[in-house]
Amino acid sequence: MTKIVMLDYIPMLNNGGHRHPADIKPSMINSLLDSMSIILTSLCTFCEQLSLNEAIIVNLGINTLDQLLMSQAGRYLLLYYCIYALELYTVCYSTLSLILLYLIQLNYILLTNIVGYLQYSCSEIANLVYTYILLEGLLDVSELDALVVETLLDYLWVPCDLIIRYYRAYWYFEGVYFNLNIPYVQRSAYWLCVVIWNNIGWWTYQLMIIGWYSLSCLCIRLVPTILAIINLILTYIDLIIYLYDIYSNYSNMTWLGILYSTINSIIRYDISRIHAYQHLLTVIIPNYCLAIYNSGLILSSLLLDIYHYQIGLTILALQYLVAPLYISCSLLIYILCYIMTELLYSRSFYIDLLLRLLEIIYLDILVNSLISIIILILSVDVAYLIQLQVIILSQYINIISGYVAMPTTILITWYLYNIAVYIYYLVDYIATISTLIIWLLERILWVYGICANNIEPVVIDLPQLTLTSLDALLNQLLSEWCLLDAIMNVVTSVILLITVSCLGVLRIILFIAVYPVYCIGVLLLNTLLQVVVGLISYIIGTFMNAIILICDIYVYSIHRPFLPLIMYVYFVAAIILEPIIDIIHTIILAEHALFNTYCYIIFDILQPLHLQAFEFYRDLIWLIADLILAYIDLIRSTLVEGIISFIKWRLEQDFQLVYDICEFYLDEVKPRIIRYWNIYSRWVRFLIYCAGNNINLLVLLYVQFKGYTLPMIILFDLTRIQLYATIPVIISSYIYQGILQTMLIISYYNTLLVATLEFIQIWLTILSVSPEMLYTSTLGILLRSYYLLYEILLLEPTWVLFECLSTCVGLVELYLVTVETTVSNILIIDLILMEVLLEDIRQVATILTCILDWYILETCLDMQYADILLLMSSGLQSTVLNTIFDLLSLLGLLDETSIRFILELTVQVCTIPAALYSTIIYPYIVLVTRCLLYLPDVVQLYLTIGEYLLRETLYQLLIDWASCKLYSYNLYLLELYNIYYFWLSLLEKYWTFTYHIYNYTTLVELSPDLLISLISYIIDICILSLELLLEDIRWGSTIFVNLLDWYLLDTQLNIQYIDILLITSYSVQNTLLTVVFYILNLCGILNEISIQILFEITVQICTILATIYCTVVLPYILIILEILSYLPEIVQLYLDIGEHLLLEILWQLLIDLLYYRAYDYILIAQLLCKVTYLLYIVLEQLLLVIIDLYIYIIGDLLIIGSCHVGNHIIDILCSAENVYFLYFMIFIGYLLCGIFAFFYHGYLGTRGIFYLSEMIIMGILIFSIVTLYYNLKYHLALDIILGELALSNEVIFTNIITFDILSILGVLLVATLTAIILTFGVEYMLREAFAYNVLATLVLFSASIICFIVSYSFGLMIIFWEISGTLSLFLIDMYYARIRTTQAVTRTFALNRFGDLWMFTASIEIYSLCHNDALPTLFALLPYAQFNLSILGNLIFDFTIPTVIVFSIFSAAACKCAQFLLFVWLPDAMEAPTPASALIHSSTLVVMGIFMILRFAPILHLSVYTLYIMSILGSLTVAYGAILATQTSDLKKAVAYSTISQIGYLFTGCAFLAFRATLIYLILHAICKALLFVLVGYIVHMFGGTTSLRRMGGIYYIVPDIAIYMFILCMVLAGAPYTVGFFAKELIVTTLTNTSSPVATFIICCWIISFACTPFYLYRICVLPLFGRPRCSRRVFRNIVSPQSTYNFIDSDSSLNSLLHKFTNLITRWSVQGRFTNLLHLLLLLIVLFCGEFLVFLVTGLFGTSTTLFSDTAIDDSVYQLTDYYLLSYYRVRNIQLLIIVLFALVTLYITAINNQLTFNIIYLSVVLPILAIIFICLGHYFLVDFTVYIYNISNSLIFELLCDLAIC
């Protein structure tokens, strides 16, 4: 009955696959349950019958396993039970599969019953399978019939039949399946392994599907149902784990175990039965070993399949969230990988284990007969596994080799070179000192010998040499020698006396101690060098010999898959040699001068590579090869029976010699290799550690080495690549010699191995003929010798190889993870981009189709739209297709899916130009869709489409040309060129495409005939295109002739038509010739037909051109010549007619026509030269035409040559690059001017310094504006690298300057302020004695600031930082005679040095991190440098390197900008002259300090603590500066404290990263503060030098213009409503109010304090001196200013001033009465109190009264928009603001018009207002604000109209 059930359900599974749960009915489940009960009953019956049969077997007398195996009945009985068990297993499996598929539709009761059945049945089935495995392992089925085995295998048929069929096909292919000599035990066990594993995989898959659907469908059911399903899942997981344990137990019985059990069963018999096993040894055992080998191969492939299958299974398990199953699969993968690793790495262990087992048996005969075969089988098996692994590792082997060796090679070489250099200098220094001491001693001895009246020097006691003896020596010399000798000896004695008295006994002791040490050191150095050289020579020789042995054994063995692995081993050996050779080369370079004699010893290091060891092994190999070849020849030439005794005698002698040599190698050489290899392995591990820690700084470098491309990853700076590039050149000669010797040895080994194999084959033949040869001792010696050879040549290289692989495994894992992640991300992104691109192209195609429909319906062809469509189609076609092909070629995605995808894209792209000629859209799409699967058809399709498009395009071109569309012809012809280029490039890309397809798959192949037909087809298309072009040009010639006839009939000389003809003719001939030559060069079809066509085309083109030239251009040129011949008359005519006609006639004639045609003539001449060179042999008529044309062209060029050159020079000078170059040269000139004026100011004088500086500053301003225009228009930022200075390996000083928007704005600001202050300084200090000194210092000071601004390296910034700081000290110390000045300079110096200390701290950190000071390098590396600097064990702070650098820069800027607690020096700076104070306050503080923070803006966010400190410090400075300004009564110090307070705003803005707002307020504050200082200087000067506010007043009555200027400046600085200061400061306040940090409250409190104090000190600064009553004496007030004074700004004698004088007298009367003064003071106090910051806070909504003025959600960081709900409307705010500016300008113009002394007004009008306008316009352009809109709105405003009416009245 079970048989019937099986036949019912098995076909349903095999044929139908998995049934849908809805197809299964409850009746089928009931029958399945009945079948389950029958199965369980049969199972019990089987167990009972098994027990009965065991009893029957015992009764038959079969007590042992051997008896059961030897019994035929027992074998058939066991086979019957196995078949029955498998039948039950198959039925149970089918039943369980159906039950699992029906689980989703079951209810709770049925589900619980099924769970119980499944638990019982699964355990029973597992027991059955395990029983079968045990029984099958005991069977010997080799003698059974093959049909019985086939029946047994048929019962193992499972739902995974596809895998079984695959393996059957594989066995059939290998010729093993029908070999009856193969033991079926192994095959049956193998099939059972496959069946069990496939069942596990299928069950797992079903389990995941069922679990997923069960959880999703039953999640809304009752909890017991879900628990039952979970119980079912856990039960099946237990079943899988149980079956895996069974599989593991079975897999432990490896083929070695089976062989070992077989040998054990054989050797249990007596030795007397050995003869009975001769047949077994000669026939069965070799076949058995062959079966073991084949089974091992299949098992290896099975393990790999299991490995890959489990990877997919693991991913699927993760997707279905089955955690226990995932753990089981992961464990299984780990165990399988471990098994493969053991098989890969434990070959020597298996061999040793087998040898030990065989040594226990004491059967020499069996050992001598089987050992070589077993070793061969094991090596082949493991070799196959290694081959599988090498396929994976071969792609990364070369990278790993460079990865390991190269980084530390360079590092060690560099350090050794430095050490050698230092030793050289040390030795040189010691030698110099020793030489000096020796010379002194010799001199002493010589003098003392003369003193003793001895000619030869005598040995004396050195301590006896005293001053007394020297005096005696001097006296004796004077008495005995002549005067000259006496004088020389006196000089010598004096030198000796000075030397002895200064150095004394120490130098003598030094000489006595150093000289012997020096001699001993040189001796030791020579000895040590010789020892090291000998040791290195021995190590290299030994190791290279070992590597060569590895190459010999593996490269030319029968296992060729080892070749990539052996090349890797050889490259490792070459890399090992490189460090040693680098060390030698470095020593040679460093010590060449002192140790030249040692070079020969060093070069002898590589001698063992080709002299000693090679000769020894070569002789040894030739000896063995000669012996074996002699034996082979002897065996081949004589009879086997007659030479057996001779062979025995020779073998005993010769192989004993080989055996002794091998034993000597094992005893002597092998320990040395092991010791040297241990040293090398430690070295390699260190290299891996170094490379692993620096993985982020690796650079990929390709080095071509002897035909092999070796990618090596090196670890060193890019600047050292040039140093290392010489290393391969040095070592190439030595490596090449090693390669030659290695190839020679490999050839020797090849001969040896071939002879050995032939010898073994013949020897096996001998053994099969004469089995008694097994018992001789000669064969035992032979086999032991081979065993030793295998141990030497096979095992040791394997050990070395796996040591290398084990050391590189860490790098392989790291590299694979990185590459895998990167490639996967790139593939995902590119696929998404391609999908988006396809959708985009579809939309564009739809849009263009609509446009074309509209275009076709139009009655008149509008050329503009046609050009647009052509350009769009051409651009899309070329760009999109090239991008797609490049992406697919790079990523290797050229499979079936990508072919379909790219064809779809091509259809979409090519539909656009095809729609222009609406006849081929439908055929094209049909053809494309027809050829989606075959590549040759696709290529043919594109060629067909190309021809069709070409014909249609040319036809359309002829129609358009016939319509006289001359301009469009050029575009159409370029479109033709693009189409040609597109199809040719497309064909080239398809060649590449075909190559990739041919490499990766074998589905598509291009036959040679097809390729030839494709090429011929291309040539036909090109010839056809040339014919069409010729026809096209003939049409064009006719049209041109008609046009020229029409032109000649015209009476007027129309320049426009001439331009049309010239441009068209040039475009036609240039484009056509380019297309023709390009096509001919690409296709190579310069045959007779193409030359004829080309000639006709050229004749037509040149005829057109010559006709146009002769009929149009030549008369035009003759007219020009005639005009030029009457040049004097023309000049007189120009004087009469005027400048307008001059520009309209002569300039337009020469420049607009001839200049633009000259370059065209040159190109025409070049093209015609090419044509002439090709055709001058055949065609003489064309030569005449070309010669005539040349005559006209040369005449034309002679006329316009000078004009062309001049305009070309102007264009060169006006280009952007030259603007930047001239800009840089002006900077250098200004710096040199400052240096010259500072050191040689006496040659120039005050006026010379002033005029020279002002001229250069004007140039700087002009070029700054031009450069700013280029930067804003083209978004440029030019960086100029002036060179590098390597102070050491770790410190590289880089000279970089930059011209970006920030630096140019800074230069504009500083230059403007310098010009203002220099003009003011000349007038202010005209009567000072040291005025030139002040001006020279100011010029150099501003030059250093400008250089600081444009510097883009930290080293340059430090240099100019120090220069400017030093010059500021010079400026402060001008009145050095004053005590207060000296004290001020001291305090300023101390605080500046404190800031410089922080700058040097930042430089140390930057050089230690980046090794150079370039700011781009710092900005790139600093975000990734998170190295902690712990202070007090992290109890206080935990700083990082970016925090230290940012804090140091902030601290330096805080010192320079006089922040809180660091502002003491700023009031002291008021001791300087007023011009110096103005420049210091406006430039040094504002520009340098804040500019440095803005320059380092990209890294400020890396230190949050620094930003908090900066915001707190800036807020304290704001409040404290304002408080101090209210308390001081000194005018200059009040302005200084106001500067401190205002800079606090800038610091706070930088702390909140509002850099754009900070930059705007920086420029505004600098200009206003500089002008304020100028006005304060005038006021102080007018009051006789007093600065006390208590002694000032009434300035408005005397000089009202100064009062107006100062009042406006104070309002701007205070932030009066609708002024620039109001909006600039509001940007910073808005940033603060939008911040929710805990520091914001404290900052707001500080700012409120400042806002409260600001009106008071501005009131005191502005109102008291200007509008207050005069507080000085009448004499002083009377003598302040006279109308004729230099500093009077109003001329009282002017008639225009009467109204102003009346108004002044009125004010004076009111002032005397006191009414107007009080009212004016009250009004100004109210304005100052309620202006500025309070109104800003009010508008921004901080006090809850209104909304913010600017939008919080702006489009950009720098673009603020106004909305409708604000307090004031947008245009009203802007109009009122600009109205104030216009009123201010009108007042200035009025004052200028009525003033005689225009000094200050000229400054303001010529410098300040233009610069302010330019800066605001540039900033508006930068912030996307259009000021023309505001001007337009002002012109339309009612207030402006009213003002104009008043002005007219």
Swiss-Prot record:
InterPro entries: ND/Mrp_TM (IPR001750), NU5C-like (IPR003945)
Subcellular location: Hydrogenosome membrane
EC code: 7.1.1.2
UniProt record, GO biological process: ATP synthesis coupled electron transport; electron transport coupled proton transport
Gene Ontology CC annotations of this record: hydrogenosomal membrane
Enzyme class (EC, first level): translocase
UniProt catalytic activity: a ubiquinone + NADH + 5 H(+)(in) = a ubiquinol + NAD(+) + 4 H(+)(out)
Pfam families: Proton_antipo_M
Keywords: Hydrogenosome, Membrane, NAD, Translocase, Transmembrane, Transmembrane helix, Ubiquinone
Domain of life the protein comes from: Eukaryota
Keyword RNA-binding attributed: no
TM helices/strands, residue ranges: 76-93, 98-120, 190-212, 222-244, 279-301, 316-338, 358-380, 390-412, 419-441, 483-505, 510-532, 536-558, 565-587, 621-640, 683-705, 718-740, 745-767, 797-819, 868-890, 905-927, 966-988, 1008-1030, 1073-1095, 1105-1127, 1172-1194, 1219-1241, 1248-1270, 1296-1318, 1330-1352, 1357-1379, 1418-1440, 1444-1466, 1478-1500, 1504-1526, 1533-1555, 1559-1581, 1602-1624, 1639-1661, 1719-1741, 1773-1795, 1802-1824
Keyword Transmembrane helix attributed: yes
GO-annotated molecular function: NADH dehydrogenase (ubiquinone) activity
Membrane-topology descriptor: Multi-pass membrane protein
Entry-linked PANTHER family: NADH-UBIQUINONE OXIDOREDUCTASE CHAIN 5
Family, as annotated: Belongs to the complex I subunit 5 family.
UniProt protein name: NADH-ubiquinone oxidoreductase chain 5
Recorded name of the encoding gene: nad5
